[in-house]
């Protein structure tokens, strides 16, 4: 099929990847209202076109935590990303490396830290959950540091997994899930060979390395449910700082007061995020949550935004709403599932081209030039 946008990659991934993995990435929690609002709220913000400005020199690059990024985006942590392409985390990391942006490895990745880090030149980021087993957390931080990871992304909006009803229907969870997955593999032979056979082992690499035994995909949801720690508090940041000296970003902030606390407890950045609508359905979209957070802490801490970004225009919208950078999750997973490393590289090229068009026609030569004045909120017209 012809690929011209991220939405095309979504359709291509739907065809190639079996339903239990496609819907795991594509779905949200409960009735998926927040998932839908993440997209629609961005769509309802129009760009303010300005003309007859000299836009012959345009720069999409930024510096973030001492790193030069070719565009203001980072590939977000995605659990079990290695199930969308053969050793998928390695392919996605190499694509990000080639395009000059960071890749964030999830705690619950298929490929372990020690496999991904040597495959790329630039330092990757590492994402960590608060888990009941503090020994695992300490081990993961030590391994990430030893592998040269530059930035820690500390995810705080998962003290318990969200209720993802779509997973029950797709075979990711629910009755007879193992049989349903095998049957889906038969109807998706290219994926079954490339990932199912050539992409083994299908284990949670970081967890298995620590446990000394294989924690497979069948154990994935159960392991998360058992090990997430609902006692998480701001004091956990102080404990983590004992083992991590580099930049630390708190992911899962939707309230200005929490953003202020992140500043107070010494975080270097926050990610304004509702976990892509995968945790608590009914919360604010990131686009709606971002402006008051930016008003509260802009300049005191780096602000990254995710959830709902489907094209380069959405990146410009998030920047104008107050973000310093963005994270891409579903968009790169669709591309990875559709075409592996090449798909992710092409997706990033598409986003960058869309950004350049938007910046040119809103008369913003650099990323720091993009301000709220570049937007028109259609809901107020």
From Swiss-Prot:
Catalytic activity: (S)-lactate + A = pyruvate + AH2
Catalytic-site annotation from UniProt: 275
Keywords of the record: Cell inner membrane, Cell membrane, Flavoprotein, FMN, Membrane, Oxidoreductase
Family annotation (InterPro entries): Aldolase_TIM (IPR013785), Alpha-hydoxy_acid_DH_FMN (IPR012133), FMN-dep_DH (IPR000262), FMN_HAD (IPR037396), FMN_hydac_DH_AS (IPR008259), LldD (IPR020920)
Gene3D superfamilies per the UniProt record, alphabetical: Aldolase class I
Binding site for FMN: 106, 127, 155, 251, 306-330
CC cofactor: FMN
Keyword Coiled coil listed: no
Compartments it resides in: Cell inner membrane
CDD domains: alpha_hydroxyacid_oxid_FMN
Domain FMN hydroxy acid dehydrogenase span(s) in chain numbering: 1-380
GO BP term (any one): aerobic respiration
Protein family (similarity comment): Belongs to the FMN-dependent alpha-hydroxy acid dehydrogenase family.
Protein's name according to its UniProt entry: L-lactate dehydrogenase
């Amino acid at each position: 099929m012809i690929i011209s946008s991220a939405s095309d990659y979504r359709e291509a991934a739907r065809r190639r990847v079996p339903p239990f993995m496609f819907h795991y990435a594509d779905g949200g929690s409960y009735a998926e209202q927040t998932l839908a609002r993440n997209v629609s709220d961005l769509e309802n913000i129009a760009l303010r076109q300005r003309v007859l400005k000299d836009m012959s020199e345009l720069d999409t690059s930024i510096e973030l935590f001492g790193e030069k990024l070719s565009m203001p985006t980072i590939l977000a942590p995605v659990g079990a990303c290695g199930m969308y392409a053969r050793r998928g985390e390695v392919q996605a990391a190499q694509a990000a490396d080639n395009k000059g942006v960071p890749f964030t490895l999830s705690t619950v990745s298929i490929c372990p830290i020690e496999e991904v880090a040597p495959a790329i030149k630039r330092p990757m980021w590492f994402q960590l959950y608060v888990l009941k087993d503090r020994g695992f957390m300490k081990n993961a931080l030590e391994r990430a540091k030893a592998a040269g990871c530059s930035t820690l992304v500390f995810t705080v909006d998962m003290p318990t997994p969200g209720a993802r009803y779509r997973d029950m229907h797709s075979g990711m969870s629910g009755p007879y899930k193992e049989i349903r997955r095998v049957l889906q593999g038969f109807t998706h032979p290219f994926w079954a060979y490339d990932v199912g056979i050539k992409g083994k082992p299908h284990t949670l690499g970081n967890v298995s390395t620590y446990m000394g035994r294989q924690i497979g995909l069948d154990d994935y949801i159960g392991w998360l449910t058992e090990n997430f720690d609902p006692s998480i508090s701001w004091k956990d940041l102080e404990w983590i700082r004992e083992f991590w000296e580099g930049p630390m970003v708190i992911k899962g902030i939707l309230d200005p007061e929490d953003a202020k606390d992140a500043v107070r407890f010494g975080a270097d950045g926050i990610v304004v995020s509702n976990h892509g609508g995968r945790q608590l359905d009914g919360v604010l979209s990131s686009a709606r949550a971002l402006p008051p957070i930016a008003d509260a802490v802009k300049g005191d801490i780096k602000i990254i935004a995710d959830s709902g970004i489907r094209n380069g225009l959405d990146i410009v919208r998030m920047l104008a709403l107050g973000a310093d950078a963005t994270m891409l999750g579903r968009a790169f997973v669709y591309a990875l599932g559709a075409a592996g490393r090449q798909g992710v590289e092409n997706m990033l090229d598409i986003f960058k081209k869309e950004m350049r068009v938007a910046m040119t026609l809103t008369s913003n030569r650099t990323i720091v030039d993009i301000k709220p004045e570049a937007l028109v909120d259609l809901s107020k017209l």
